[in-house]
Amino acid sequence: MKKYLNLTALLLVGISNVTWANAVNELQNRLNKIDVLSADYTQQVTDAQGKKIQQGSGKIQLKRPNLFRMDNETPQESQIIADGKTLWFYDPFVEQVTANWVEDTLSDTPFVLLTSNNPSHWQQYIVEQKSDTFIIKPKSKKSTIKQFNIRIEKDGVLKNFSTIENDGQSNLYILRKITNPALNDAIFTFTLPKGVEFDDQRKK
């Protein structure tokens, strides 16, 4: 009986691995159809009970491979830029810039998956597919993100994405005015503003 149970467990693990691989491949195939993207977004923040606690808006720009930029405009300005190696976060309100290696922030910043084909990046997540929505969960127990959802159609049209934090708070980004213009790599280069506090986590 024990042998049969072990065999069943192995079969279930095998099926699970195949399902995960299929979901990752399908998501990557759809994302690969986006060479460049520029769009406005609206942000909806809800608490664990589903109550809306904040709204926002901004602009997102993507370029494959590995280039990502989000400029939040309301209710408070902030900027996230991934230049392929470093993830920059700029908060003008407190005049602070934080820099981390992309590799060190993957479990907490799944946005970079939108432009990444790096197998080591995807290996850090479990991916499930439900129609046009892909549910991405970090394997790391230390992650502050419980779940990252991407809704993207078969033809590569990115509709929205969202994060769910460990405390249940959800951040939904709905894209609109989507275009595919030529984007210069310089857009994804961060220049440190004068007079800001610079927290360089890459040196630690």
UniProtKB/Swiss-Prot annotation:
InterPro entries: LolA/LolB/LppX (IPR029046), OM_lipoprot_carrier_LolA-like (IPR004564), OM_lipoprot_carrier_LolA_Pbac (IPR018323). It is found in: Periplasm. Keywords: Chaperone, Periplasm, Protein transport, Signal, Transport. Gene3D superfamilies: Lipoprotein localisation LolA/LolB/LppX. One of its GO terms (cellular component) is outer membrane-bounded periplasmic space. It holds the Pfam family LolA. Residues 1-21 form the signal peptide. CDD domains: LolA. Its main location: periplasm. GO terms for biological process: lipoprotein localization to outer membrane; lipoprotein transport. It comes from the Bacteria. PANTHER family: OUTER-MEMBRANE LIPOPROTEIN CARRIER PROTEIN. Belongs to the LolA family. Monomer. Participates in the translocation of lipoproteins from the inner membrane to the outer membrane. Only forms a complex with a lipoprotein if the residue after the N-terminal Cys is not an aspartate (The Asp acts as a targeting signal to indicate that the lipoprotein should stay in the inner membrane). This is Outer-membrane lipoprotein carrier protein. The lineage of its organism: Bacteria, Pseudomonadati, Pseudomonadota, Gammaproteobacteria, Pasteurellales.
